[in-house]
Regions:
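Short S/T/G/P-rich N-terminal loop/turn motif that feeds into the first structured element of a domain
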Residues: 1-50, 56-70, 78-94
Length: 94
């Protein structure tokens, strides 16, 4: 199992619009990515978010990057900072 954590800034005034776009378009795009097992997004501060994506392997995460970059490009209008990414193999789980 491999985890990728992405943090970024977003326009709080447009959060409803962003969530509607995610539900309408991005959900299906993410479901179609091979090896992507789950995605959770949470607000970590005013205008700040964190995405936690779980993949079956590092190879799947690497292979998905082109598609993920397209998705982030589609959502760029809502973002106020460049995404920062950290990732690694899971070493313990509950």
């Amino acid at each position: 199992m491999y985890i990728r954590v992405t943090t970024y800034g977003f326009d709080e005034a447009r959060i409803g619009e962003a969530l509607a776009k995610m539900d309408a378009t991005i959900r299906d795009d993410l479901k179609a990515i091979a090896g992507l097992e789950s995605v959770e997004e949470c607000r970590i501060g005013e205008g700040q978010a964190m995405i936690i994506a779980r993949y079956d392997s590092e190879a799947s995460a690497t292979a998905a990057q082109e598609k993920i970059q397209v998705i982030f490009g589609d959502m760029a209008e809502f973002m106020t900072s460049q995404p920062e990414i950290k990732s690694g193999d899971v070493i313990w789980t509950l």
